[in-house]
Amino acid sequence: MKRIVIVGTTGSGKTTLAKALADKMGLVHIDLDDLHHMPGWKERPADDFRRLLTEATRAENWAVAGNYAGKAQDITWPQADTLIWCDMPYWINFWRLLERTVRRAYTGEMVCNGNTEPFFKQFYSKDSILWWFLKTWHKNRKKYNAVFANPQDYPHLKLIRLRSYKQAREFLDKA
């Protein structure tokens, strides 16, 4: 595993796993959210995002965290040797995302280039990460189920499906 793409619904542990693998294996950590979001939660123009991602993936070894299928998949997947799907159970994933969201709203923790997740925005807005989870969990599951059901479509990728946080920890311990 030298070039890893980690996918999954928001709050599934993609970034945490990518950082841990990068630290343990000496890989460059690339977080697609960091490339996508500019300060003030402004969306980086697609051409700039793709340029930054192309530059980042010139590294010999990396771990990319994030989905962004329409903007990133054609850059990362062909170069990758491993695809990891953080496929966490719905309610466990939602609960952990809720805990993270409350913590970030309370502490003002900075994410994605100095942005914060204010309480009102996360609990009373259509821009809520919780709302995003509700909109995308089933869609992501359908998409990645299809990928993992047809491994012959991605013969260059080792496909790894992690279905629990315990399984993710065990995978990391063995990596």
How should each PLM-predicted stretch be described?
Residues I6:
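Hydrophobic anchor at the beta1->P-loop junction of P-loop NTPases
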Residues K24, W131-A175:
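NTP-dependent small-molecule kinase module
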Residues T10:
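The conserved Walker
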